[in-house]
Amino acid sequence: MLFKSIFISSLATSALAIYLPEDHYLAKAPAIQEGSCNCSGDNIRYNKSLASDYICGDKRLGPSRLPTKLPLGTFVTGYDRFGGLSPNDFLGKWYNSTQGPDGREAGWIYPEKYGFHLDEEKLPVKSNIDLMPGTLVDRFGYNTGRYISPATAPFAQRALHPQNLDNDVNKEFPNNYHVYNVTRMFTVQAGPIRPWFGQPGFGVQFFLGNGINVKDYLDNGHLVELKPSDLVKDRTGCGFQREDEEPVSDEL
């Protein structure tokens, strides 16, 4: 319990900080070349018309080329979208194709107990904290969801499946990536994210609670949506130099 208290305290301190915008360009990240992925297996749903844009021609596996401009911290570093598995084995482990009475598939398999990391007693590690005005948060998914995270948190720490990266509408940002500014204080359940979908997790998630979602907070003025590009700032001078730019001269 002492560890849990210390851990939550640390999370609360770091999570409430307003994340400074960073500019992360992934344009140099090459598209996954044909033949570099083993696309065999019964779990793969190959669609020839999608083969140039999605791994193995299957949208569930995410785009073959990552978004070119994504404000998500150390997005590329150490990111292995399949967690060491082949695409077929990844889908076999994390996707349930069983159809229900309505004919719809069960779909992605999500962790129990709201996705929080579990302690030695199998209880979720979480605590109530207040999100203060000016805090930037974001999420991958529609505003009908109940989860948000500190803006710009590394993707691998969110433990999300690769379909969240689909970017056929806008090549710079994933289709369903949303950024919000907290304008009125509200309370959330905060805690570490359980490793899942082959990802390391242990980022911070904010669970809004049962019976309430992001849209509710947008409607009542607690959140205001921003453009994802608002997190990406083009700045010059000391501290903002990129690798492909000339050094800033000290001379007048």
Put a short name on every predicted segment.
Residues 5-7, 124, 141:
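Generic hydrophobic-segment detector
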